[in-house]
A protein has these predicted regions:
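Intrinsically disordered, low-complexity repeat/linker tracts enriched for polar/charged residues
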Residues: 394-442
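Generic long, charged, amphipathic alpha-helical segments
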Residues: 298-322
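Polar-ligand-bearing catalytic/cofactor-coordination segments
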Residues: 2-301, 321-404, 437-453
Length: 453
């Protein structure tokens, strides 16, 4: 594995400057990715804004309290009924508001050949997502309001610990309970590729339970692979679209990137950070929810009041939106590190570039998006940046190799010259001793791997 240090930018160079995509993508390819991004961008941004505006409208005005009270009456008007019905209403309204935006984005992607799923399948996925969200959210909300009833002032202390624990548990259970809801997984048949992927993981010192194929082609033409799970649940998952489109060596590089996440413990570290973030978020919620002006605006008496549920949802949405750019920045850094791991593990920068080009074209990516959009929303570096980083890695590797070769040649030359001098000195000494009638001592043997002093 190569240990070449990360290349440093040239003096005066701007490390944040966008690399030139011209050598790797034609004007038509760049234009196609840019056109897709511009076509779906208004709808994607609209979905984000709508997803934030709705909880703010309901949580910072009496409208949310009125909604929770009204739907609670339909189910008995008890505190528990108001909490559960209010939470369900917020989830359903939020999902319903997102549907038009999601449908518009889907229509755009259909025009670009990225969608293989019909509208019926899309609607079924939306219903599955809604059901899964309700199954996860309703018990959590019920537990939360049990804590607020226990102590309207200090509920957030045990809630913070519970949030951290649940984050860790859900991270472990996600590949077992959530992924199968949306995809079918089958073991990759025995063959050269499966053997190569398992050997790659073994060479990297990573144990995986299995190599699975996800039936992503039912929905999309996009290419992807990932490693999911922790410990006994860890497995390599490849999209069937990747296996039918990419070269085997490119598949190995995609998996090598994902193994980088495992090698650097990105999942457990991310889970730990997520757990800490969840605990901090709950603590902040506890402090804000105790502020009387906010409670008055929401039409609630205190945090134990079921009518405070929309306020808590609004504050959580604000915290999530505010932390989004920071989370994206951390994600881009992690992805860049995984790219470097793939290069070190395979040593194949040329094939890495080919793989990045294939992924960008298959996914119709904007290879050089506006920097502000990249900073705010991108979880991965752009294809242009990833290719430039791979070429910089290769250049640094070549330079290091050349320097190492020159150093070895210089050492060997020094050893040879010193050995010749020692030989001449020894012969002269032997000749002098022989002339004096004394036996010549045993000639000193020089280790060819060390310099003669």
């Amino acid at each position: 594995m190569d240990t070449t240090p990360a290349p440093q930018p040239a003096p005066g160079a701007d490390p944040a400057a966008t690399p030139d995509p011209t050598p790797d993508f034609t004007p038509a390819e760049r234009a196609r990715g840019r056109a897709l991004r511009r076509a779906q961008q208004p709808w994607a941004l609209g979905a984000r804004l709508a997803g934030l505006a709705l909880p703010l409208l309901l949580g910072l005005t009496p409208a949310g309290a009125a909604l929770a009270t009204a739907v609670g009456r339909w189910f008995g008007d008890s505190r528990t009924a108001t909490v559960l019905a209010g939470a369900a209403a917020l989830v359903v309204l939020g999902q319903a508001l997102q549907l038009p935006f999601g449908a518009a984005v889907r229509s755009v992607r259909v025009r670009y050949g990225l969608v293989t799923q019909g509208w019926a399948g899309w609607a079924l996925d939306a219903l599955r997502g809604l059901a899964l969200t309700l199954v996860l959210v309703l018990p959590l909300v019920l537990g939360l309001f049990a804590l607020t009833a226990w102590s309207p002032q200090h509920w957030w202390l045990p809630a913070a610990g519970a949030a951290a624990l649940l984050t860790a548990v859900l991270s472990f259970l996600h590949p077992l309970l959530v992924e199968p809801v949306f995809n079918r997984f089958t073991p990759m048949p025995p063959g050269e590729l499966r053997t190569a992927l398992l050997a790659l993981a073994d060479r990297d010192g990573i144990r995986v339970r299995d190599v699975l194929v996800a039936d992503a082609s039912r929905r999309t033409t996009a290419l992807n692979a990932y490693v999911s799970g922790l410990g006994a649940t860890r497995r390599i998952v490849a999209y069937d679209t990747l296996l039918t489109t990419a070269e085997p060596r490119e598949v190995e590089l995609v998996v090598a990137h994902e193994l980088g996440h495992v090698k650097h413990r990105d999942v457990p570290v991310g889970t730990a950070l997520g757990a800490v973030g969840a605990a901090v978020a709950v603590a902040v919620l506890g402090l804000l929810a105790a502020w009387q002006p906010l409670l008055d605006a929401a039409g609630a008496s205190d945090a134990a009041d079921p009518r405070a549920l929309p306020l808590l949802a609004a504050l959580a949405a604000l915290l999530g939106a505010a932390s989004g750019p920071a989370q994206c920045a951390v994600s881009r850094r992690i992805e860049a590190r995984a790219d470097r791991h793939a290069l070190e593990l395979t040593g194949d920068a040329e094939q890495f570039v080919a793989m990045q080009r294939r992924l960008a074209l298959a996914n119709v990516s904007d290879v050089d998006p506006p920097r502000v959009l990249e900073l705010l929303f991108a979880t991965h570096p752009s294809a242009t940046r990833r290719i430039a980083a791979a070429r910089a890695w290769q250049a640094a590797r070549v330079t290091r190799t050349a320097q190492g070769t020159q150093g070895r040649q210089g050492t060997e030359g020094t050893q040879g010259a010193q050995g010749t001098q020692a030989s001449h000195s020894s012969h002269a000494s032997q000749a002098g001793q022989a002339g004096q009638g004394r036996p010549a001592p045993e000639q000193h043997r020089t280790d060819p791997g060390k310099s003669v002093v």
